[in-house]
From Swiss-Prot:
Membrane protein topology class: Multi-pass membrane protein
Gene label: lspA
A molecular function GO annotation: aspartic-type endopeptidase activity
Protein's UniProt name: Lipoprotein signal peptidase
Enzyme Commission number(s) of this protein: 3.4.23.36
Source species taxonomy: Bacteria, Pseudomonadati, Pseudomonadota, Gammaproteobacteria, Enterobacterales
Organism: Klebsiella pneumoniae subsp. pneumoniae (strain ATCC 700721 / MGH 78578)
Length: 166
């Protein structure tokens, strides 16, 4: 018996589309309006700064000769497949987990697009305090982190009790 997509977690795939539109749109604006390395202050402690990331988070393996592009692309595809299957197997009413999965999928697909299209990931958010700068990141990275945090949070929330019928 097949399930209606609306009754599964796939009902939340619109979140993936929203993340992709926002992420790829922001990267397009950076690519069209910034030179590599250019910085524009937004607020105290926050800049827009165009950087290219050839590795993973925190530029992990960025100088590894190019194989990491395909390695991280494969990981992103695998994660997207696994999370999509988990969404299909869960009920649409499991909002927190499904939204978390959708945020991670959207972020992974945004960065995957960059890796495959440009050969690098476009980063632009530069958070700093004084002279200390956090690693430059993008909106896809933010979606992935928020999704992961929601999964952890869900683990700490009390499970709904099922009322027994007499």
């Amino acid at each position: 018996m097949s399930k209606s997509i609306c009754s599964t977690g796939l009902r939340w795939l619109w979140v993936v589309v929203a993340v992709l539109i926002i992420d790829l749109g922001s990267k397009f604006l950076i690519l069209q309006n910034f030179a590599l390395g250019e910085t524009v202050p937004l607020f105290p402690s926050l800049n827009l700064h165009y950087a290219r990331n050839y590795g993973a988070a925190f530029s992990f393996l960025a100088d590894s000769g190019g194989w990491q592009r395909w390695f991280f692309s494969g990981i992103a595809i695998g994660i997207c497949v696994v999370l999509t299957v988990l969404m299909y197997r869960s009920k649409a009413t499991q909002k927190l987990n499904n939204i978390a999965y959708a945020l991670i999928i959207g972020g992974a697909l945004g960065n995957l697009f960059d890796r495959l299209w440009h050969g690098f990931v476009v980063d632009m958010i530069d958070f700093y305090v004084g002279d200390w700068h956090f690693a430059t990141f993008n909106l896809a990275d933010s979606a992935i982190c928020i999704g992961a945090a929601l999964i952890v949070l869900e683990g700490f929330l009390p499970k709904p009790t099922v009322k027994e019928q007499a």
